[in-house]
């Protein structure tokens, strides 16, 4: 179980998270939902060790076991789709990248560069790159932005099938409802 206890994060005078406590199972897909500015991304960043809270603590999760998908795709324009995955695949560089391409439905785009991809395709490539890290816990910030709803549902099901804990920020109600649990931030 991942325990978040009395977490408070401020950006100057603005309070992003105020005394937030939540338990998140280390299995299945958990969606973080709520209005813009309620702290979903901030909570994800704290869980991933990318920022420190002013108060509170987290137990049951170490940043080294997480893979983080940022809201921005952060793709390298000079690397092909396949190279983006082979750069990070730790175990089976010849096999694993194609597996992740298949999971995010980018087969046939191996030699394409990011500039040739649609927004949804670039988002799926960023997700594939995150998956290729083969970390224990996936922290995904709006993983389906620009991805059509049917494809997003298929990929979400594949994420569930991985059997890893996934914590994602979801703005799409139908995707949040398809997750194993929903945590609402206000």
Where are the model-predicted features located?
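Conserved structural motif at the start of ABC-family nucleotide-binding domains
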Residues: 2, 17-19
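Helix-to-loop junction immediately C-terminal to a conserved catalytic motif
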Residues: 48
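Q-loop/switch helix immediately C-terminal to the Walker
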Residues: 79-91
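Conserved ABC ATPase "signature" region
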Residues: 94-109
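Conserved ABC ATPase signature
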Residues: 113-121
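Hydrophobic anchor residue at the start of the ABC signature
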Residues: 127
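Catalytic Walker B motif of ABC-type/P-loop ATPase nucleotide-binding domains
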Residues: 138-142
